């Protein structure tokens, strides 16, 4: 179901991203972290300074394998095909904020972008399930009940081992997904760039967070933690578990569903506190 709501201008979105990158590019990581209210760069493009893996085993594994390659954070199971995954978390914690991050993933991995996360991997997750019957952009309760606001699924068409097209199906009714707003599958497909870098932007604000996501300037989902209804969602319990602030994190899903040798890639991680 598509609800009318003004969309972020693609041109303005791209100009804002360029301006933010230019502002933070010359700042050392430590100095950038001290500037509140402005865009800061959480990833220097060369090292994993300012980041850490889950310190203890969680449901997805001991941490997965994370390294920097060609200016991007790369994640994969450790070793490939072992089922051993995990998360990479920012050392700095955020409560109310906006974040932009570029991603370029292989087709097949189930990943995620974590908000207000703790070292146990509990969080509000922006799904990055880039596989058949997957979803990218809606909200899921990782370790906080398993509530799910996905409004539709995505499926891939693969030719000669390469993803060539994406389709959408299994559209949910508003009472099933519970979103304040969702784009249509057609809008999502139009926004996504196959085999290219895609920019995810997320705004997270409030005691019971109001979370909005965009892909390449297209508004994808608006989730209201104060009013969301789902059998597995208890807003007070989630708030007690996560607190007011948490890390930003990226995920390598554990288990056998992750294709052997598949990788996820992230870069240009810009955050500003609100």
PLM feature segments, named:
Residues 1-12, 19-21:
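N-terminal secretory signal peptides
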Residues 13-14, 250:
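Extended, hydrophobic interaction surfaces within ordered domains
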Residues 14-16, 271:
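General helical structural elements
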Residues 16, 20-23, 166:
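Intrinsically disordered/low-complexity terminal segments and short unstructured peptides
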Residues 21, 25, 270-273:
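C-terminal alpha-helix/helix-terminus motif
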Residues 26-31:
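C-terminal segment of classical bacterial N-terminal signal peptides
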Residues 33-274:
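Carbohydrate-interacting regions of secretory-pathway proteins
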């Amino acid at each position: 179901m598509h609800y009318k709501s003004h969309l972020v201008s693609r041109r303005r979105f791209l100009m804002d991203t360029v301006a933010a990158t230019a502002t933070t590019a010359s700042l050392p990581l430590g100095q950038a972290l001290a500037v509140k209210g402005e865009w800061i760069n959480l990833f220097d493009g060369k090292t994993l300074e300012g980041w850490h893996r889950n310190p203890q085993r969680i449901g997805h594994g001991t941490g997965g394998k994370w390294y920097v390659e060609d200016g991007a954070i790369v994640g994969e199971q450790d070793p490939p095909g072992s089922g051993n995954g995990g998360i990479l978390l920012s050392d700095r914690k955020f409560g109310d904020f906006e974040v932009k991050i570029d991603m370029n993933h292989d087709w097949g991995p189930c990943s995620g972008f974590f908000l207000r996360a703790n070292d146990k991997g509990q969080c509000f997750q922006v799904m990055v399930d880039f596989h058949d019957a997957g979803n990218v952009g809606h909200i899921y309760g990782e370790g906080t009940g398993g509530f799910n606001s996905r409004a539709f699924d995505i499926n891939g068409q693969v030719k000669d081992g390469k993803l060539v097209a994406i389709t959408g199906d299994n559209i949910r009714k508003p009472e099933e997904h519970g979103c304040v707003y969702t784009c249509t599958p057609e809008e999502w497909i139009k926004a996504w760039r196959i085999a290219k870098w895609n920019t995810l932007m997320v705004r997270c604000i409030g005691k019971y967070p109001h979370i909005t996501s965009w892909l390449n300037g297209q508004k994808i989902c608006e989730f209201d933690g104060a009013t969301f209804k789902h059998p597995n969602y208890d807003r007070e319990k989630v708030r007690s578990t996560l607190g007011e602030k948490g890390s930003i994190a990226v995920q390598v899903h554990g288990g056998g569903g992750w294709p052997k040798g598949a990788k996820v890639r992230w870069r240009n991680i810009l955050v500003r506190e609100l």
